[in-house]
Every structure is written in structure tokens, then in C-alpha cells.
Swiss-Prot record:
Name under which the protein is recorded: GPI transamidase component GAB1
Subunit organization: Forms a complex with GPI16, GPI17, GPI8 and GAA1.
Subcellular localization(s) per the UniProt record: Endoplasmic reticulum membrane
Pathway connected to this protein: Glycolipid biosynthesis; glycosylphosphatidylinositol-anchor biosynthesis
Keywords: Cell cycle, Cell division, Endoplasmic reticulum, GPI-anchor biosynthesis, Membrane, Transmembrane, Transmembrane helix
Membrane-spanning segments: 136-156, 161-181, 191-211, 225-245, 251-271, 298-318, 325-345, 352-372
GO cellular component: endoplasmic reticulum; endoplasmic reticulum membrane; GPI-anchor transamidase complex
Lumenal face of the membrane: 157-160, 212-224, 272-297, 346-351
Amino acid sequence: MDSTALKVALGCIAIRLAVNSLFPSLQQQLDQSVEFSTPVTSFRSLQEGIYLLRNNIQVYNHGVVHHPPILIFFLSLFNSDRLISLIYALIDGLIAYQLTEVTKAFKNLKLKVWLPGLLYAVNPLTLLSCISRSSIIFTNFAISSSLYCILAEGNVLLSSVMISISGYLSVYPILLLIPLLGMLKSWRQRILSAIVSILSLLILLLFSYSILGSQSWSFLTQVYGSIITFEKVFPNLGLWWYFFIEMFDTFIPFFKAVFNIFIAVFITPFTLRYHKQPFYAFILCIGWIVLTKPYPSLGDAGFFFSFLPFFTPLFGYLRYPIISALLFLHAIVLAPIFYHLWVVLGSGNSNFFYAISLVYALAIASILVDLNWAMLRIEYDNGIPNFKLKVTQI
């Protein structure tokens, strides 16, 4: 085990445990924040599912729990609040470790191996997401594990299994199977990876059924159907909620289908266009899902930002990094203020909060556009950076 990666992981764990100890009430405050908690990732909802499962009560008949059965079953094994905090810290530490190990696969970048892992460890967004005990951390862990398995260990099968787990936990990450297949060298590996992913997902669903026993397949509707159909129109940092508050009921099913197609439709073009740089296509796909998913949180953005150091050789091509950074800072500072004005004080309205969520989306979108431009420029320059050359976008 590499000492650098281990130090980063231990530092990440220590920071999270220290914050938990110093600010014991912070978890509940963050869990009530729409920036870090959504109806499908909330720890309150997870606790409700754990309670119902332990008491042999039907978990998914009350419209409150939207977490997958295996996750609920896993966390129900631990009774201590401190132990659960430790589990979340360990998961975050493992993500930091994996990011550090993945960096070693890109020695030609001349990137400090500890930088992505350290950025993840000290990033306030990932730190607070972990403290809030949002279940998004498990999805992020599955995604980082998939990259770690294929890039650091060369294990295609395990990487495919981890992508299936991420899809099992949050639906949309299963789309990352497409750029994952683009990272494989032969069609034989791609077909095998796709088969393993599908079989793994089926096994996870069957195991979920066995956990619930007589409750049959009701979890499919509450866990996955509620996300795809955006069942709970709840304010968040995403683009969906305001549209479906204002929209006539007649048009809602059609536009929900359109929004879902919109998430999926750009994954394959990213993969095909950047087939020579499949890892970067994978990162862009992560960013696209973060931008377009129905229930995003700042934990999603923090995870995506941890991969930005891999674009270091392209930073000279970025056209408006300062604008993107200021947009993002503007959004994360004003989002809780505008939500408080709207919901708590009643001196604002939903337009306040949705306006700032649009700024947040614009920040993520501008980062994605800038990264795409940078990748096209390095390709135009035949892999040799030429920052002085001025090229006009047509």
C-alpha cells in the first residue's frame, strides 16, 4: 500500500471525525439543507428505512423511503451513531485513496499524485456532504472504485460490478457504463463488461427482493421510479423542480420523459468524440449527470471537481475559468440565503431560489463547455500545447 495515498486517506478520515466531534449538531443542520440533502439521499429518510426494516414493517409503503434495500440493510447492522459516522468517514477516506492511486496511471501528466485525493479530502463540499450523511457518498464511492479497479488494478470485471452498484444506488450513474466500455481495448472486453454489469445489477435486485421478503418488488417504484418520474417535486439545486411546479399537469409526463432523455442523450456523443481520451470522456459524463440529474446536491459537484486536476495540462486553454469559479461561489453563497428568505422568513419567493439554482447550473455548464473546448484545442494542436495560437470557435 502506497504511503502517500494512505496519508491522504488517513488525513481525510481524521478531518471528518474531527468535525463530527467538534460540531455534533452540524449533521442534523446539514441534513435539513436542500444544498446537501434531497428526498432520495436524505439521512432522515435512510433512518426511517432502517427503523421500518428492523421492526419488520413494510419499508416502501409510506412514500418516505427512497433508498435501495441493500443500503438500508447494510446500515441497519450498526446501532451506534458514532460507528455510522466512522463508516461515512472511512468511505470518504477510501475515495481519497482511490483518487490518489488513479493519478499514478497518468505519469505523463506530471501531476502530483496526492493532489486529486487531497483536493477531495479538504474540499468543503465533500466534507460537509459526508458530515450530512447523504447517501450520495456511497454512489461516489462506487464510481471511484470502478475507475480505481480499471486504471490502478486493471480489473475489468470488478470495475463493471462497481458501475452496476453505482447504478443500483442512484439510477443515472449506470449510464457511465458507456464511457467505461470506451476505456476497454477490445470488443471482447466490452461485451464481457456489459454482460457482467447487467448480471450484477440483476443479482443486486434479486438480493434486494430477498431482503424485503413478502414486500415483493415495491421498492422498484419507490427507489427508481421516484427518481426517474421526479415523484417528489422538491426544491433543490437542479433544473427540474421549478419547471414541474409551473407546468400544466397535461404536459408533465411528456416533459419528464424529455428531461430523462436529455440526461442520457449526451453520454454516447462524449464517449465517441473523445474515444482517444476515454478517461476524460468518463469525467465529462460525470459532470453532465451532475448538471442534469433531477435531485443534485453539492456533494455531486464536489466529487466532480476532484477530477479537475487531471485536466491540468489543458488549463492554459480555458477561456473563462475565473467567471466559472465566481459563478459557482456566487451560487453556493446565495443559495442558502435565498432559500431562507423564501421558506423561513417568507420575504422572498420561489423565483429567488430558482434564479440562484440557474446560476449554479450555469457554473457547472460553463466548466463543462470550457473543458470541452480545451480538449478540442489540444487535439487541434496534435497533443502539443500551443497557448499562444488564437483559434476562433465556429
